[in-house]
């Protein structure tokens, strides 16, 4: 689960955006600038990332759900891969407005997706070629839009977002509903309203991979710890002294 300063350096987490695009609210996390590019202070980023991991780990240990969001081209595959590894829902294509604030409607779409999958497995022989084509197109669209959240039965307990500016609608919906946010914030965006800020590069594929892997590791570790605790509790109960009662003693 641990991420080192060296790993952050190698992934280019410290490279911010051009100085002319900076957001002054990120000043506490900026070390300086080089060639008109802001350099993010990794001595701040590392402990803040570790804090975000700790939160994700505790949440997972308490059976909470974290929704991973990364729809930028360089993040899609990495986010989907790590979310699947951790067994959590994810959004990797586009954020549909109302995905959280109008979750009731989204659940209807999820049901439609699951019904269509079951229908496909049963066979589409009764449909005409044209009907099959229309069916396939609808299924493909639903899979693309909500495939990553099809097993999310309720609103998530937290959201992990790579690039809070790019995903401002997701951030806004989470804030409105009081859902805690873990967010990667680059030098050109504001960290305000983000519960667990990770100051860092949100464009580099290597940096994105590091964040996604780190959060997925924390989730898996939290879940594993919870299982271990349950096993210990069961073992402790089972070790209580067993006294056999002689039924003939009376």
UniProtKB/Swiss-Prot annotation:
GO biological process: translation
Gene Ontology CC entries for this record: cytosolic small ribosomal subunit
InterPro entries: Ribosomal_uS2, Ribosomal_uS2_bac/mit/plastid, Ribosomal_uS2_CS, Ribosomal_uS2_flav_dom_sf
Keyword tags: Ribonucleoprotein, Ribosomal protein
Alphabetized PROSITE patterns for the sequence: RIBOSOMAL_S2_1 (PS00962)
GO molecular function: structural constituent of ribosome
One Pfam family from the record: Ribosomal_S2
NCBIfam families referenced in this protein's UniProt entry, alphabetically: rpsB_bact
PANTHER family, per database record: 30S RIBOSOMAL PROTEIN S2 PROKARYOTIC AND ORGANELLAR, SMALL RIBOSOMAL SUBUNIT PROTEIN US2M
Family membership noted in the UniProt record: Belongs to the universal ribosomal protein uS2 family.
Protein name, per record: Small ribosomal subunit protein uS2
Organism for this UniProt entry: Acidovorax sp. (strain JS42)
Gene: rpsB
């Amino acid at each position: 689960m641990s991420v080192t300063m060296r790993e952050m350096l190698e992934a280019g987490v410290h490279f911010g955006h051009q100085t002319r695009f900076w957001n002054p609210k990120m000043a506490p996390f900026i070390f300086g600038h080089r060639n008109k590019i802001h350099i993010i202070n990794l001595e701040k980023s590392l402990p803040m990332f570790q804090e975000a991991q700790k939160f994700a780990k505790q949440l997972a240990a308490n059976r909470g759900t974290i929704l991973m969001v990364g729809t930028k081209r360089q993040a899609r595959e990495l986010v989907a891969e790590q979310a699947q590894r951790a067994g959590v829902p994810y959004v990797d294509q586009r954020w549909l407005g109302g995905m959280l604030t109008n979750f009731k409607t989204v659940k209807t779409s999820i049901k439609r997706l699951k019904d269509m999958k079951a229908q496909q497995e049963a066979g589409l022989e009764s449909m005409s070629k044209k009907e099959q084509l229309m069916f396939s197109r609808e299924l493909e669209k639903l899979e693309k839009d909500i495939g990553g959240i099809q097993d999310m039965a309720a609103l998530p307990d937290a959201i992990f977002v790579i690039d809070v500016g790019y995903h401002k609608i997701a951030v806004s919906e989470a804030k409105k509903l009081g859902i805690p946010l873990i967010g990667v914030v680059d030098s050109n965006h504001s960290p305000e309203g983000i519960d667990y800020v990770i100051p860092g590069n949100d464009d580099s594929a290597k940096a994105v991979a590091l964040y996604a892997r780190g959060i997925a590791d924390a989730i898996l570790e939290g879940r594993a710890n919870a299982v271990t605790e349950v096993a210990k509790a069961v073992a402790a109960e089972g070790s209580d002294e067993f006294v056999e009662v002689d039924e003939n003693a009376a």
